[in-house]
Amino acid sequence: MDSSARSGATGSSNPRAWIVAGVAVAGVLVLAEVARRRRRWLRGKSSPPPYSGAFCDRLELAPPPQPPPPAARQLLPDLTFAVSDNFEIEGYVAGFGNPDWKRTHKAASHTAAAVKTLLKQGATCVGRTVMDELGFGVTGENLHCGTPINPASPSVVPGGSCSGSAVAVSAQLVEFALGTDTTGDLRIPASFCGVLCFRPSQGVVSTLGTLPNSHSLDTIGWLARDPHILSRVGDALLPAAACGLKGKRQLVFADDCFELLKIPNQKTVDVIENAVRTLPYGFQPPKHINIGQYISSNVPSLKEFCEPSTKLQEGKSALKALCTVMLLLQRYEFKANHEDWVNTVKPKLGLEVSTRVLQAVNFTDDNIKSLYIVRTEWRAALKNLLKDTGILVLPTMAGHPLKRNSKQRLSSEFEDKMYAFVSIAALSGSCQATVPLGNHNDHPISISFVAAHGSDKFLLRAILDMYSAIQKQIVLASKLALPPVIDRDVDTSELLKEKGNNSFKRKQWSKAIEFYSGAIKLNDTNATYYCNRAAAYLELGRFKQAEADCDQALLLDKKISGML
């Protein structure tokens, strides 16, 4: 084991011997007190930290001494951090969130590359955190370790899979934390726990020494409360930027994604636009696009994964297809990595994770080549959209988290929206930053910024430049009397109904059925849509379908019987 590693399991933590003589007396006293309190916590002699449940392993890996001049000073002196349970640490077994995994694997012979880098830059690792089993959950609930308590909203789940890392940061147990992000594993808990998150471009930070879920989607990311610490960790882990900024930055808002939210624009889009307007320089006027339609037009190989749709719904269909490709790719690669272990050990898994693992190990790889082609096309298309100075702005999450211990499952509508948002960066391999935006209905909300693959330091710099202005606008937005949120799905379904009615009047029965079906897909609780489609079916002599629609209309609204 590295001489810098000191385990809390033995209770033999020593004072920081690396404090150099030239440090001021006050600084020495502060550091000594920090070290003393940390040792007491590690030995279990002090009361547990608030919001306990974040950690699964308590340990301490201390950094080497600050090098003497002329060597560069460490970037992260005196900062503490934690890592998820899928990071290897020499002499310890990485549990991957599951006791059967821990039981069937040996202690690591090396420490993860990213952890070593952070130690070298002066940070101290104080523990390993709870995560959803095998990196597959999204709620933060773990059958074996329990659910870490969300400091930002204790009555709800913290989000996963890197729940413990987000909770440790939000509860101020550490200054920052590492985790892996495959399909939102860091971005989801960051949003639910109200902390900052950075998911770097895929392949930019070494994943050596981490347990893989899906190797072409996995990235090592980090969480922090302070944007300066978020940026400093980036300076430590990311390669040096190739060149400086070549022009003013431009925010590109994904309007169709924000239309899927039930949060007022005054608390999301307007906050960011107003913040950027107050900045003296550095940003062009923002642009607004329909990202779904852009994907539909610029990722040709995605068409085989799209459901049949009207022209009006093409964008939504493309977004759903993008997240389908992401999830299929994850299943294929998880199966390649872990099928033998799953079939041999037959691990005990929580219900949600068990379902996802079974989907992965039972996956058939008929169209694998197409998945990778879509990924390549989407990365190129997003790069073409954003170029060197563009930043895509989109929601992080689709809504509020589930209640703790409610035994509810996420609705398919919630999952579809959530995965659509996270797939934009995940499948393109682009970098994404998540920034808290205060609260809505007593739950944390956030917004995300995506830059092209490789533009990581550019994006971190932009977040630093915007952050203070965003905080001021959050305060102003919280004081506004906001109108009720319009459900845009209802608006769209009514528009489709009217298009169906117009087609019916023109005796275009098949076209009318297509529009009514689109309205039903968006809102399947409106009896009128079924009645109208039944009338069109009758005109075509499709009596069985007409009868089925009439029956459904009656189930939804008994009063409608007089119309049938």
Where are these predicted regions, by residue range?
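Short, surface-exposed loop/helix-turn segments at secondary-structure junctions
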Residues: 370, 401-419
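Alpha-helical tetratricopeptide repeat
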Residues: 2-3, 20, 160, 474-564
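Structural helix-boundary/capping segments
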Residues: 2-6, 18-22, 41-52, 176, ...
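Gly/Ser-rich catalytic/binding loops embedded in alpha/beta enzyme cores
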Residues: 2-175, 380, 384
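Gly/Ser-rich, acidic/histidine-flanked active-site/gating loops
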Residues: 6-20, 33-35, 81, 87, ...
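Short helix-loop capping/hinge segments that flank enzyme active sites or metal/cofactor-binding pockets
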Residues: 78-99, 303-374, 436-443
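Short, Asp-centered acidic motifs that coordinate Mg2+ and/or phosphate
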Residues: 124, 175-176, 221, 391
